[in-house]
């Protein structure tokens, strides 16, 4: 496997649903890159997913990654729940459709070429990189520029 990369992610939503944003910090050796984007109308879970997706999609070749998130929804979803969702045709155990299926499918595609160690940290607990991502996500949520078409199309 290629380079060893650290990815830190966070999502934010003002209202849930409401304006939202994601923040990503990528680190390779001594190099760091930050990414963020704001959306007019979305949810916190969609922004948490987008942060992980964008972080992974930014990489141009297969990597060994430690991805750190403060979202149990993202971490458990991608490491545990997704396997049964796929077996059931993207349905939960109660036969209802998986929420945010567009992003789960995109994340599933994004992880396929990487070796990823998914780590969880408690949000707002002084974890430096998580705090930086939170600041990026909140700033993006406060200045949205994009439409989350997946949220608009999949709303009940």
From Swiss-Prot:
Binds 1 Mg(2+) ion per subunit. May bind a second metal ion at a regulatory site, or after substrate binding. Coiled coil: none annotated. Residues 1-142 form the RNase H type-1 domain. Its cofactor is Mg(2+). It catalyses: Endonucleolytic cleavage to 5'-phosphomonoester. The lineage of its organism: Bacteria, Pseudomonadati, Pseudomonadota, Gammaproteobacteria, Enterobacterales. This is Ribonuclease H. PROSITE patterns: RNASE_H_1. Endonuclease that specifically degrades the RNA of RNA-DNA hybrids.
